[in-house]
Amino acid sequence: MSNRKTKGNSAVHPECLSQVQRILRERFCHQSPHSNLFGVQVQYKHLIELLKRTAINGESNSVLIVGPRGSGKTMLINHALKELMEIREVSENVLQVHLNGLMQINDKIALTEITRQLNLENVVGDKVFGSFAENLSFLLEALKKGNRANSCPVIFILDEFDLFAHQKNQTLLYNLFDISQSAQTPVAVIGLTCRLDILELLEKRVKSRFSHRQIHLMNSFDFPQYMKIFKEQLSLPEEFPNKVFAERWNENTQSLSEDSTVREVLQKLFNVNKSLRSLHMLLMLALNRVTVSHPFMTSADLMEAQHLCSLDSKASIIHGLSVLEICLIIAMKHLNDIYEEEPFNFQMVYNEFQKFIQRKAHSVYNFEKPVVMKAFEHLQQLELIKPMERTSVNSQREYQLVKLLLDNTQIMNALQKYSNCPTDVRQWATSSLSWL
């Protein structure tokens, strides 16, 4: 089959498209070793120099990488570690320990994970230690090859660093920072957090042992730079096997970046959230629409992707509810309007629902109370309402306080798209306090 095809609906070899999907998906999921860093070159230089001082010179360091979610904190540290490990003398000696505050929720779990990642389970064996500090010191001592100069440097990466600060006594942080200040095994402690006030969470003894180095990532690029990132992220590399297809794909990407509809889509996304994560999500959804019969991305693909990105998941759930459940949500909406967002209980919702039935005199909505209760519990299972306190065994379910997790705009927009919604139910939703 000839590679010289027109841009229309001409057939493209499936293997070629498969390679495109693989390359771009790896890039969008931050799994590609060749992806670029955008707008953080200064921060990257600072971080790599700090890591080299630990790995090559045996100097202990600590630093916090601070920035909002999606700003590239993980990508920054991964790129720095990749470059560091390409140095032969470093790759043979430096050890890495990756911890996450969502997974290592206490000191014992963290210590077990450190032992596992350092491959020291056999060394520890059945030894009993008096304290966390003693155990950690033993692990690092086991890595020594004689003197400090020959010790294996260890790089600790603590993701969700602020969650470690909420652990009891901050024992893990204290001991890691204490070691980084002492003359023991050279270590680098790298914390990743989205909390700008992270230092306020640290105890005085922990703060005194921290170097107070911070690297801030703030997504400071403007829209023209954002458009440049869009083109770079969607372009195929020069080494792509099918040169003709790569050239046409990149020409199509260039024309997309100049399309007014595409620029409008990207401007909206930029105004709401200019993190690369949100851009990658948009491009990933658009890429899913590329097929053998539709081999080039279009503005329509990006518009559909934007629509999917902006979908309200809770409003979408409403479309699948029964009329009874819709009625209960409307009753809760009115209770919110009356009591100004104060919590309510099932009995209050049921009474409001009964007013509607009596006003309309519709026997079609006259369900037994246990049936209404079942519908109310289903809304709770769908997390459209949430209990305000933990349910006790002896408490009556109908008097348990709950809160509606939908606002009026979400409810009204969902009702507009709700198929076969009875007219009187729709009118009830738009009515004011006059129903009382």
Curated annotation (Swiss-Prot):
GO molecular function: ATP binding; ATP hydrolysis activity; DNA replication origin binding; nucleotide binding
Main location per the UniProt record: nucleus
Subcellular location: Nucleus
Biological processes, Gene Ontology terms: DNA replication initiation
Residues reported in the UniProt entry to bind ATP: G67, P68, R69, G70, S71, G72, K73, T74
Pfam families hit by this protein: AAA (PF00004), ORC4_C (PF14629)
GO cellular component, one term: nucleus
Keyword vocabulary terms for this entry: ATP-binding, DNA replication, DNA-binding, Methylation, Nucleotide-binding, Nucleus
Modification N6-methyllysine occurs at: K7
Cited CDD domains: AAA
Record family assignment: Belongs to the ORC4 family.
Function: Component of the origin recognition complex (ORC) that binds origins of replication. DNA-binding is ATP-dependent. The specific DNA sequences that define origins of replication have not been identified yet. ORC is required to assemble the pre-replication complex necessary to initiate DNA replication. Binds histone H3 and H4 trimethylation marks H3K9me3, H3K27me3 and H4K20me3.
Subunit structure: Component of ORC, a complex composed of at least 6 subunits: ORC1, ORC2, ORC3, ORC4, ORC5 and ORC6. ORC is regulated in a cell-cycle dependent manner. It is sequentially assembled at the exit from anaphase of mitosis and disassembled as cells enter S phase. Interacts with DBF4. Interacts with POLQ.
PANTHER family tied to this protein: ORIGIN RECOGNITION COMPLEX SUBUNIT 4 (PTHR12087:SF0)
Annotated protein name in UniProt: Origin recognition complex subunit 4
